[in-house]
Swiss-Prot record:
UniProt entry tagged with the keyword tRNA-binding: no
Polar residues composition-biased segments: 151-218, 264-287, 314-325, 376-408, 537-565
Similarity-based family: Belongs to the ERT1/acuK family.
Span of the signal peptide: none
Coiled coil: none
Gene Ontology cellular-component annotations: nucleus
GO terms, biological process: cellular response to starvation; gluconeogenesis
DNA-binding region: 65-93
Protein name, UniProt field: Transcription activator of gluconeogenesis acuK
Protein source organism: Aspergillus fumigatus (strain CBS 144.89 / FGSC A1163 / CEA10)
Length: 683
């Protein structure tokens, strides 16, 4: 048994040795793997080191494509980029969209792309519109609906095709492009009417209204596109802006500013009078013979707002033989009756031209045609402008515009020229004599105690007056008066526009300007306050008579010839002290002493008691029993209208008010005038 075991051992060892000869061990496999790896590494090119300064730098793209932007990878300027070409996305490679700033949130994405210039606007719809021989425009309905969704979709409504089928020559209406609002209308009206008279005679006037089943208006939806720079003739390439949207906004502001003060002339209407129907823009209507483009505002079609009924269907004032045709019924008869009143507030006109910011008169506001005859002048002017005969009739669809003939009947505003101020002032104002008159009035009206209080207040600012006026000569004083009159010229418009009682005084307290509301509240007429009529007021607020005439304050007051007129009925401006009661006058001059040479922007808000204007007859009437019953009725019923305001304080002659006033200085830093407004009665 042992011999067999030992004999089999070499055999097993020999078998194992055979296996080792055929199969390599683990060490041999590791060496072979290292050899193959080193061989592959030696054959492959070395990768560029990111920190190597000599490596070629890739050019930074101005804007990455959408795919590279999503993947946060470096892109190139070429389209399609190399990365999209490798991935097979060259057909979908386009510029990515950056996050817009807040002030550009409403801008279209394409408008913010740099370098697009004026090529962003898509003129595909405009270029694909063939013009027929009769001047109308034919558009594919499908194309219109698809392109219209990009802008402002407007509700569909009936289109009114008023045009002629007779072909027009090309040189009759030369223009830059079908959508450009600038049209060269240099033909005279006589020549234009002669060239179109044959077509008008050959074809009878007809107005066709197409329903929903008929072809819709091709310019209903996308006709008004504010992103088109050609619409306002903007040259965006000449504007130094980084993006197109900013240049378009700047150009629009400039376009609005240049036409803000223009009148609705023919040139103004030619710049922006593209109407609702495209067929009427390139031809002359056979009903009137009047051109549909670039003529007077009365003949204009609605402005660039497509078929919007709220903006285009406003009926306008027409001749009595012209009937209104309210298309969409925006103004029913029940809702328009209040607008036909002559005292209705004037609204800004939506004129055909973009430069009209005028307010039309009440006769040009939307109203119902009453059918009665207007003046013959109005009929002649309308017929002349529209080309109609005396008995011609036609339905009219227009927008409210400022007719030329309506300027003759509207409220005329007087022309004011500030140059008259400098021409009229030849002498300096006599402030010294006016202060003497004020001193005499204070001594005559107030008690010695209150006169002393007012004198102390004026004495506190007397050194400042002397210091500021000692170097002024005659020319300076004349210039000072011109400054006062020029400032007062500006305040007149402010007083007329302000709805609260307002007065303007000189530094002496003399009334220089007054508003209508102040006269209604106090009963003081404007001419009396300004010294144009005699002052017959006897109401002093129940102030006590002055003391003995031998007071020390009257000894040094100069007596000049001007004081002789300081009697009831004197023709000179009223002092502010005559409009207030005793306590209010003392309080005013104490505040004036603090504010005259103090804060130049300061103001005073306090209460006072205004004195009503009362003659001797008014004082007797105030004591009657009838007036007592009227005051009781007024106290129960309240205040209604101007009559109620006039009755405020009619019994005791005082109206308690809250008011605000300030001091305005001239170029020499001297108090020039006192502006007092917001006299609100305490009811």
């Amino acid at each position: 048994m042992k011999t067999e075991v030992n004999g089999s051992a070499p055999a097993l060892a020999g078998d194992h040795g055979g296996v080792d000869q055929d199969t390599p061990d683990a060490g041999d496999r590791t060496e072979q793997a290292k050899h193959k790896t080193n061989g592959a590494t030696e054959n492959a090119p070395k990768s560029a080191n990111a920190k190597d300064p000599s490596r070629p730098r890739r050019k930074k793209a101005r804007r990455a494509c959408f795919a590279c932007q999503r993947a946060h990878l470096t892109c190139g300027d070429e389209r399609p980029c190399q990365r999209c070409i490798k991935r097979g996305l060259q057909d979908a490679c386009h510029d990515g969209v950056r996050k817009k700033a807040k002030y550009l949130h409403d801008a279209p994405d394409g408008a913010l792309m740099p370098g697009v210039g004026g090529n962003f606007y898509n003129n595909a719809m405009r270029n694909n519109m063939p013009l027929s021989r009769n001047g109308t425009t034919t558009v594919n309905t499908t194309t219109q609906q698809n392109s219209g969704s990009n802008y402002y979709p407007t509700p569909q409504s009936n289109s009114y095709n008023v045009y002629q089928d007779t072909p027009l020559t090309q040189n009759s209406f030369p223009s830059q492009s079908p959508v450009s609002p600038t049209f060269n209308m240099k033909t005279t009206p006589t020549a234009r009417s002669n060239s179109l008279s044959s077509s008008v005679n050959q074809q009878p006037p007809s107005t066709t209204v197409s329903g929903a089943t008929q072809s819709q208006n091709p310019f209903a939806g996308p006709f008004f596109d504010p992103s088109d720079p050609a619409l306002f003739n903007f040259d965006l390439s000449s504007m130094n802006f980084e993006n197109r949207y900013g240049a378009l906004e700047f150009g629009m502001l400039g376009h609005m500013a240049t036409g803000a003060g223009d009148s609705p002339t023919d040139s103004a209407t030619q710049r922006g009078s593209i109407g609702r129907s495209g067929s009427t823009q390139y031809s002359t209507t056979p009903l009137t013979g009047a051109p549909g483009f670039g003529e007077s505002p009365g003949n204009q079609q609605p402005f660039l707002f497509g078929n919007d009924p709220l903006l285009n269907e406003w009926p306008n004032s027409q001749a009595p033989n012209q009937g209104h045709l309210n298309v969409s019924g925006v103004y029913p008869q029940g809702g328009m009756m209040h607008m036909a009143k002559s005292d209705a507030p004037h609204a800004f006109a939506i004129e055909s031209g973009p430069a009209s910011f005028s307010s039309p008169s009440a006769t040009t506001s939307p109203h119902i045609n009453s059918g009665h005859d207007e003046s013959s002048l109005s009929n002649a002017a309308v017929n002349k402008s529209t080309g109609l005969t005396a008995n011609g009739q036609r339905p009219a669809i227009t927008t409210p515009s400022l007719k030329h003939q309506s300027l003759q009947f509207g409220v005329k505003r007087r022309q004011r020229n500030p140059s008259t101020v400098y021409e009229s002032v030849k002498e300096p104002y006599a402030y010294t004599n006016r202060f003497h008159n004020l001193t005499a009035f204070i001594q005559r009206r107030f008690s010695p105690q209150k006169t002393l209080q007012i004198a102390k207040a004026l004495a506190s600012i007397r050194p400042s007056f002397i210091a500021t006026t000692k170097t002024l000569n005659r020319d300076d004083l004349i210039f000072m008066e011109k400054c006062f009159q020029r400032t007062l010229w500006e305040y007149e418009d402010f007083i007329n526009a302000c709805g609260t009682p307002t007065i303007v005084c000189r530094r002496t307290g003399e009334i220089a300007a007054v508003g209508k509301e102040f006269s209604i509240l106090t009963g003081w007429k404007k001419d009396v306050l300004l010294g144009k009529e005699p002052n017959l007021n006897v109401n002093t607020g129940g102030s006590s008579a002055p003391g003995s005439g031998n007071t020390s304050r009257g000894s040094f007051t100069p007596r000049s010839s001007t004081l002789e007129t300081a009697t009831p009925g004197r023709p000179q401006p009223v002092f502010l002290a005559e409009l207030l009661d005793d306590d209010s006058v003392v309080e005013f001059y104490e505040d004036f002493a603090r504010l005259a040479f103090g804060d130049s922007r300061g103001s005073v808000m306090t209460t006072c008691k205004l004195l009503k204007y009362k003659t001797k007859e008014d004082m007797e009437l105030a004591q009657s029993d009838d007036n007592q019953r009227w005051n009781n009725h007024l106290r129960k019923g309240g205040i209604a209208g101007e009559a109620g305001m006039n009755q405020l304080g009619f019994k005791d002659g005082k109206v308690e008010c809250a008011y605000c006033w300030t001091v305005k200085r001239d170029v020499f830093d001297i108090p020039m005038l006192i502006v007092m407004n917001v006299f609100l009665p305490c009811i």
